[in-house]
């Protein structure tokens, strides 16, 4: 298995430069639900990328894969759409790979895989003790 170079951006012109430089995957980071609580007080970057950014990046790149990290599994609220809608829109907007972060159960993974429904590659980000135990 070869090393895959990834670059996180929501700027199409930067994505094109990265792609030209040999980056294999352009990464759009939609994850924000609960992130401030999980990373509060830490010196970390919290992206505010959008589903519209997925489309803009998809339109800008030609050879790199488009990796999109969605939010952890969630239902719709007044503030955000459901996981199913977020995942479907990401794929419709050009995601080649959809990443599920911060999952804690097999049921969440099953829901994620069902929502993707083989329309894109999937990637699981193991970052909880519960995920490691699955």
Language model segments and positions:
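Active-site beta->alpha loop and helix N-cap motifs at the rims of alpha/beta catalytic domains
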Residues: 13-25, 30-111, 115, 125-127
